[in-house]
Curated annotation (Swiss-Prot):
Subcellular location: Cytoplasm
Domain characteristics, as noted in the entry: Has three domains with a flexible linker between the domains II and III and assumes an 'L' shape. Domain III is highly mobile and contacts RuvB.
Gene (name only): ruvA
CDD domains tied to this protein: UBA_RuvA_C
InterPro entries in the record: DNA_helicase_Holl-junc_RuvA_I (IPR013849), Hlx-hairpin-Hlx_DNA-bd_motif (IPR003583), NA-bd_OB-fold (IPR012340), RuvA (IPR000085), RuvA_2-like (IPR010994), RuvA_C (IPR011114), RuvA_C_sf (IPR036267)
Protein name as it appears in the record: Holliday junction branch migration complex subunit RuvA
Keywords, comma-separated and alphabetical: Cytoplasm, DNA damage, DNA recombination, DNA repair, DNA-binding
Entry GO CC: cytoplasm; Holliday junction helicase complex; Holliday junction resolvase complex
Region of interest (Flexible linker), residue spans: 136-140
Region of interest: Domain III: 141-194
Gene3D superfamilies xrefs: 5' to 3' exonuclease, C-terminal subdomain, DNA helicase RuvA subunit, C-terminal domain, Nucleic acid-binding proteins
Species for this entry: Tropheryma whipplei (strain Twist)
Amino acid sequence: MIASLSGLLEAVRPGSVVVNMHGIGFLVRVPQSFNPEVDAEVKLYTSLQVREDSVSLYGFASVLECTVFEQLITISGVGPRVALAILSVLTPAEVAAAVLEGDDKPLQRVSGVGKKLAGTIVLQLAGKLTSVPLENRKQEQAVDRSAEIVQALIGLGWQRQESAAAVESVLEKDQSLTMPEILRNALRYLAKQE
């Protein structure tokens, strides 16, 4: 079993990378969200999958991501490719939150996962992802929320830097604001700056 690989990233292909380790290039399938520079030193936590007709190595930036992958492939109807597609769209914290909340909608955003399979995933992973920290989810949501508001301000004609500064200023004062309130306060902030 190969638990991890450390080496020089030789090539990046859609859905896979080649990691050179002591002169041997390992083809490793990775989530679409994994995108380091070529010639960078990388460490991937891996899961070796042996099938009748193939041997494939799947790699992840964190042990947590690899653990969630291995939990996903235990579910009937979820093979390594579907599990990889899920981790290309959702973070481990988002998968765990969906399972914890019994909400299959985030999983349905993944290509190849319909309502029935999403429901099966939520049902079968219940209680199995307790090691996944959920506090990251709130931080990720805050970043997503900020990015959405910055994009809205750019759409209204403001520059990216001033939009980001306005949103940051508003959120420094009050983190509990709703998106419309943040947008409104950011517009007020920008109007005062002119």
